Amino acid sequence: MSIVTNGNLNKYFQQIKNLKEEFVKKYNSGESTEEIIGKMRQIHGQAIFEDTRNKFQLAKNNKLNPSDFYNLSVDYCTLANMDKKIRHLEILQFERKHKGYTHKGLDTDKYEINRSLIRSNGPLVGTTQPIQSTQANQISMTGKGTQDPVNKVRPEIRKDDDGVDVISLHNTQTEDVTTRRVNSDVIPTEFNNTMNTQNQSNSNYLNTTEYLTNLSNTEANRLMSDYNNGNYELTDSQKQQGGNHIFEVGKPTVVNFYADWCGYSRQFMPNWEKVRDSVKKKYGERIQLSSLNVGQDTDKVNISKNAGVNGYPTVVIFKDGNTYHKVAGNASADDIVKFIDETMSR
């Protein structure tokens, strides 16, 4: 039986979340927020003390099982997440007080506490200073992305000096070129042998990482509009021993972005499998599902950021040129299915 539990830490986490909402209201009305920040730090300190006491009891026992190590990881993530939320608000407060920062009010109706960034309709507030979101990746807190005009994308394939197949997506309007090396066995024979654009656009096959890289780097909305008849190959999370799954870009695609080092990601996995089963029964071939283990791979981390992911696990739906996000760490299977249902009804 596990000795360590994180139930008490969740109590402190909820208190900080509630104070964060209070901070937003006072911040928008121009009132002082210093007292709220002070309360949040006190609560965080209480959580640290509680965690230290748990660790002390654990150290005295000297008999740890796998569940104990799992909970240690979850507790660490919980404490770190508390501090991250407080730091974001401290930065807001500091910039307004010391730098003459002219703020734009935080919209509480479109404000989701679970995100590691505070997003409003205007600025995105991160760990340094507010940055203006671009039209391509701007996402409101209701989940719907900003839609761009459709640009034409032309796929091209060639072999590099090492004889490795290289696939490029060439945006003919912006002149952006996304190039990726791929194994020849993931590109069908008719694609290798046929170089005209019409046939290529109907025969695109890539693995999960390649698909998401191209989807995000050339902007999901443009690709989805332009490749309605194209196919990509995504590695299905249940077939990681070599099996592959053909995904059509024109269909809604649900991706679970997770990291194997994250306790919340591991905790969410059983719920994700329930989501998969439920969605497949309900929607059949109308929805495509996959997972991407970001791990500590730099390319995959960039992919997740380009897709609007700010923490793990996060479920992202690519639909009709828009992206919709749901932070899944504390979400139940029913929560995710409801999120998918609401998105599909848009």
UniProtKB/Swiss-Prot annotation:
Domain Thioredoxin positions: 212-345
Xref: CDD domains: PDI_a_family
Subcellular location: Virion
Lineage top rank: taxon: Viruses
Record has GTP-binding as a keyword: no
Gene Ontology molecular function terms on file: protein-disulfide reductase activity
Any one annotated GO CC term: virion component
Keywords on record: Virion
Broad class of the protein's primary localization: virion
Coiled-coil segments on the chain, per record: none
Pfam family, one: Thioredoxin
Magnesium is among the record's keywords: no
PANTHER family attached to this UniProt entry: GEO12009P1 (PTHR45663:SF11)
Protein name: Thioredoxin domain-containing protein R362
Annotated source species: Acanthamoeba polyphaga mimivirus (APMV)
